[in-house]
A protein has these predicted regions:
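Intrinsically disordered, low-complexity acidic regions enriched in Pro/Ser/Thr
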Residues: 1-169
Length: 169
């Protein structure tokens, strides 16, 4: 079975002056994948709202203050049944307003992101992510976190295997 590859980036928040976490899976921004899955569901319900509206969790919380993507994070970012926040509502930044979550299962060889769920006060129905699952090699996952935690100008925007995601001017 082919494993997915993960990378993390750092973006300035659209809301305030802090940094947020960007997540790239197999070179694609996860936020774009999620928004595409949600778009059709929102339209089918006849809602005239913009889907998505996500912003990554605080880069500081994810990598420096806590170890969010290894399951050690603030209680505000963990929901019932061990659902970890990947994105929050970009217009408030308040956990639970419109948060995308998933379970993160970790063993010696693999990290699996599964059971994606939207915790939302905005959308009045449950979104379906169709069994979306990502499987990562534990070593590559750890290296991606290491690069994010030890971000320098040289590696801050570099994917764990050296693929350039983007750079600032």
């Amino acid at each position: 079975m082919r494993l997915d590859e993960i990378g993390f980036g750092c973006l300035k928040s659209d809301l305030e002056d802090y940094l947020t976490t960007a997540i790239y899976i197999n070179g694609t921004n996860l936020k774009e994948v999620i928004e595409e899955l949600e778009k059709e569901q929102v339209a089918k319900k006849g809602l005239h709202i913009r889907n998505g509206c996500y912003e990554g969790v605080s880069f500081f919380i994810a990598f420096h203050n806590q170890n969010h993507f290894l399951g050690r994070t603030l209680p505000d970012y963990v929901y019932h049944d061990q659902q970890y926040t990947l994105y929050d509502y970009k217009y408030s930044g308040i956990p639970g307003d419109h948060s995308l979550t998933c379970k993160i299962s970790i063993d010696a060889q693999e990290v699996v992101w599964h059971d994606f769920k939207n915790i939302s006060r905005i959308i009045p129905f449950e979104l379906d992510y169709g069994g979306l699952t990502f499987r990562f090699c534990r070593e590559q996952y750890g290296e991606a976190i290491h690069l994010a935690k030890n971000n320098t100008e040289e590696n801050m925007f570099t994917w764990a295997y050296g693929h350039m995601l983007w750079r600032t001017a």
